Regions:
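Bacterial N-terminal signal peptides that target proteins for export
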Residues: 2-15
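Hydrophobic alpha-helical targeting segments used for export or membrane insertion
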Residues: 16-22, 149
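N-terminal signal peptide c-region/cleavage motif recognized by signal peptidases
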Residues: 24-26
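Cleaved targeting-peptide boundary
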Residues: 29-36
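Mature N-terminal segment immediately following signal peptide/propeptide cleavage
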Residues: 36-56, 60
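Catalytic glycan-binding domains that act on GlcNAc-containing polysaccharides
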Residues: 54-275
């Protein structure tokens, strides 16, 4: 039976007051291009983190006391590495000692290398090349920034707010599950974590506990670092047994790690020299 039309009731008294109050409630705090609105934005984000299931303890320990970091914004506005030609980039970032170090590590750790190759189907020299290029085998991780504070600053900044808010929520998830503490999460200005520089969302999705201690530690555990890097490549379509030089399908998978063509070519060349 069709419903009968009915008259819209008029709002009176308290009901009207509630509606007007709701209309006057400020919208979610907006992004900004300076420090002025950061604290309001942060309070709003804490509420969203709680709604997303992050524990009160993690929100308090990770986000309490952080502030807007202008040095992060300066670094973000002054990126130049990937504007270089391949020859310029390779000459600046790769040395003979970087190659020999990687080759030597593979020779000395063949059992671990074989385990990673067998499990993920990715040649160890590709994984080690990424490790070497990203942080000089863990030696140059860039400990100058609080990763949580850097990500909060970039999430508040209007340039790529949605992307970095996703990364900030992910890093809270890493802390919440007990993989790392906020204090351990120090690194570069863009929020990458550990020895091969995982962004937090990728860390949550692809990190592997390969040393068997129950934690996925991409800062201190080399087995976890290399296995997680191989797992990322496998998950993005790496074809076991295939090549990785330009023109191959696996060369395209390297682009999922870093979109810069000079980076992809550098990894392929480095890996070829480590075999």
């Amino acid at each position: 039976m069709a419903s009968r039309p009915y008259a819209q009731p008029r709002l009176k008294g308290a009901a009207l007051a509630v509606l007007l109050a709701l209309a006057a409630t400020p919208a979610a705090a907006k992004c900004g291009n300076g420090a002025g609105g950061f604290e309001n934005w942060l309070q709003d984000f804490k509420g969203r983190a709680a709604s997303d299931g992050i524990s009160k303890g993690t929100i308090s320990s990770a986000l309490g006391g952080i502030g807007y970091d202008s040095k992060v914004i300066q670094r973000d506005r002054n990126q130049h590495s990937f504007k270089l030609s391949f020859q310029e980039f390779y000459a600046r970032r790769v040395s003979g000692s970087l190659i020999s170090h990687g080759r030597g590590w593979i020779n000395k750790n063949q059992a671990l290398a074989d385990r990673i190759e067998k499990r993920f189907g990715v040649p160890i020299e590709v994984v080690v090349a990424i490790w070497g290029l990203e942080t000089n085998y863990g030696a140059d991780r860039g400990q100058g920034f609080s990763i949580v504070q850097a990500l909060a600053t970039l999430a508040y900044d209007c340039r790529r707010a949605d992307f970095f808010e996703t990364q900030l929520m992910a890093v809270l998830g890493i802390i919440d599950r007990g993989d790392m503490s906020a204090g351990q999460l120090r690194g570069g200005w863009a929020g990458e974590i550990g020895q091969t520089q995982f962004l937090p969302a990728a860390y949550l999705k692809y990190a592997v506990d390969f040393d068997g201690n129950g934690r996925r530690d991409l800062v201190n555990s080399v087995p976890d670092v290399l296995a997680s890097t191989a797992n990322f490549l496998k998950a993005h379509g790496w074809s076991a047994g295939g090549g990785y030089q330009p023109g191959s399908s696996n060369f395209g998978v390297i682009a999922e790690w870093n979109k810069a063509q000079v980076y992809q070519r550098t990894i392929a060349v480095m890996a070829g020299q480590m075999k």
